[in-house]
Swiss-Prot record:
Membrane topology: Single-pass membrane protein
Protein's UniProt name: Uncharacterized protein UL9
Residues annotated as transmembrane: 189-209
Biological source species: Human cytomegalovirus (strain AD169) (HHV-5)
First and last residue of the signal peptide: 1-19
Amino acid sequence: MYRYTWLLWWITILLRIQQFYQWWKPDTTSCIQKTGYEGQNLSLPPSNALSSKDYTFSWYKDSLKALNMLCYYTEKLEEIDSKPDTIRRCFLNHTLFLINLTSHYSGIYYFDSLYTYGWVLRTPLCYNVTVYSIYQTHIHTTILLYPPTSTYNSLTISSFTSTNLTHTAVHYAAGNVEAQHDTATPHTMWIIPLVIVTTIIVLICFKFPQKAWNKFTQYRYNSMLTAA
């Protein structure tokens, strides 16, 4: 009975370590996509299902580190002075409001909460914010609203538009491949040690090394008797 209790205890510890790793470095491929344009404002609401157990809330940018914290909620609301290039407002309903967007606002924003009863970690909500420049929008609007009349200008603009879109598509695809590779690598790194450690613990609990050693000793003893 003690053997199984000890095994269950170790498995629980390993699962907690895995949960903490996923909380500290979450998978950004599942983030909610948000887009905005320079000079505009953008609102990031929290999760729709806030538990009554939740007591502490916070917003982060780029990573779940104290230096990247934007807002902190306990019994009162506090706006942290980190990230001076990001002008924002934090509201009591836990919404993050980004003001006067620029290219510096692009990135991952995390909304994190922690259960105070039982200290149960969960994956934070994240937004992948992309800010586009107004100049790019103006070019596309001009092409659509004012089509050229001459054949030469039409061919030139069509060629330019096709080249621009192709370059954007290739750049976007390359970025996706690189992001998926960067995301897959750290997750693979902790799975392999977890499997190895779990296997060793199971072998020790069921005394497989001791049984193997006893069989080896008995085999050597029988060999010595046969030789004599």
